[in-house]
């Protein structure tokens, strides 16, 4: 889906642009797209650290403060709303912890968008993934918010579409059926 692609794009971009900061921080309760992308991060020589969660599924912020380290942690990638439990992550606090250490923040907001307030001005994440089918758009459509504060290396390169962030011809529905 578009959400899965955007998660992979963020992880690949950060891994490529900040190779000296080797660590990706996630939780064990992330969506499979994050967990599988983390496996790739590890295969490419990076380290993946799992932040613990409390019994109710909330991220342990005290442990996160100890895990996220300046010059070591490149990216903290934690979902805003859990797709299985509905637990909401304290994203504002996660952003504060990560940014204080110089790390970037990605959130999978697929389950949160449209259900709880998601505002990148009040919660200044660096990357935010969305999936259209959760908002009545066609399946496979997604969106990736990239803050103007950060660099981004495109996952797909080619024709430079989407302001050179995702190349490829857009899949559009014709306004009328093709003629025979």
At which residue positions do the language-model features occur?
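Pyridoxal 5′-phosphate
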Residues: 1-180
